[in-house]
Regions:
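Iron-sulfur cluster-binding cysteine motifs and their immediate structural context
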Residues: 74-94, 101, 105-121
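C-terminal, charged low-complexity interaction regions
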Residues: 182-193
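General structural feature for long, well-ordered alpha-helical segments within catalytic domains
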Residues: 10, 14-18, 22, 77, ...
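Flexible, glycine/charged-enriched surface loops at secondary-structure junctions
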Residues: 28-34, 89, 163-177, 193
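A hydrophobic, small-residue-rich beta->alpha segment in the mid-to-C-terminal subdomain
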Residues: 120, 128-165
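Short beta-strand elements
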Residues: 54-58, 122-130
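Catalytic cores of large soluble enzymes that bind and process phosphate-bearing ligands
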Residues: 3-14, 142-149, 163, 172-175
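Small-residue-enriched alpha-helical segments and adjacent helix-cap loops
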Residues: 1-74, 80, 94, 98-99
Length: 193
């Protein structure tokens, strides 16, 4: 990371690329309302990307190898997990995907190398806002593993907002009006680009 020990991506570099491509490159594009984008280096959420129209959060997806796990009574992976997603059950480590926030803190902690690596990625939140009204952005289902995928989703979100948003309406209102599932489907599909 570029700002703290928990950073999982170069948030300054990604922010600059987003700024150059979409703020400078799209400066003549008229949107229904302002569109804020935030980039956070990890799931600790310090810069609150989920409270912006679109937020990108660094991820590190655990690469657990169950065949190597020895089911230690004092599991270092379990002890390290800050959200308690990792638990040894019946002699094997289990990671609850509904609890795991892909912070990557568990990676490399197993002395037997059952959690040696993790794939870096990006979680994208849409529809957040703060101020007089606030809304927590919702995460898109996939964790993206390439920067170009992230840039394409951002571009699709801007185009969707331009084409389907109403004048004076914030992106969160557009999502609420159209439905999250519908918007997610469009952002993950190929029709907008």
């Amino acid at each position: 990371g570029t700002t703290c020990q928990y950073g999982l991506l170069d948030s300054f570099d990604l922010s600059r690329k987003i700024h150059d491509r979409f703020y400078k490159g799209y400066e003549s594009v008229k949107l229904p309302h302002k569109f804020k984008i935030a980039v956070g280096g990890c799931p600790n959420n310090c810069v609150k990307p989920n409270l912006n129209d679109l937020g990108v959060v660094g991820q590190r997806i655990p690469g657990f190898q169950a065949d190597i796990c020895r089911g230690c009574k004092v599991c270092q992976v379990e002890n390290t997990c800050p959200v308690h997603a990792a638990k040894v059950v019946d002699g094997v480590l289990k990671i609850d995907p509904n609890l795991c926030n892909n912070c990557g803190r568990c990676i490399g902690t197993c002395p037997f190398k059952a959690m040696p690596t993790g794939e870096y990625g990006y979680r994208i939140y849409i529809g957040g806002r703060w101020g007089k009204k606030y809304a927590h952005g919702k995460p898109l289902d996939p964790v993206f593993t390439s920067e170009e995928e992230v840039m394409q989703v951002i571009e699709k979100a801007i185009l969707l907002f331009r084409e389907q948003g109403k004048t004076g309406e914030r992106f969160s209102d557009t999502i609420e009006r159209l439905g999250f599932e519908n918007v997610q489907s469009q952002l993950l599909g190929s029709e907008l680009l």
